[in-house]
């Protein structure tokens, strides 16, 4: 996965956001997605870290869904939302902007 230069994050981000990284990893394991999907999801999350804790669950879920798309792991928004304990709408509203911000062209469906 090649993220755009704007999406590079400092090394300390992984430590500061370890709770959310673990949640992404746990959900990825539950969904049986590839290591590539999990890595893409964590990279997206750490590059987009919101300052508000309220935004983090939905962002983490959207990052996992986007990571699945990037790596070709077909998972539904509903399955990802359930694994991350957020609403499907939270995932639906956030995944396309995430991909665009990272320099990807999201699918048009």
For the regions a language model picked out, list residue spans one by one:
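Non-catalytic, interaction-prone regions of core transcription and DNA-replication machinery
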Residues: 1-109
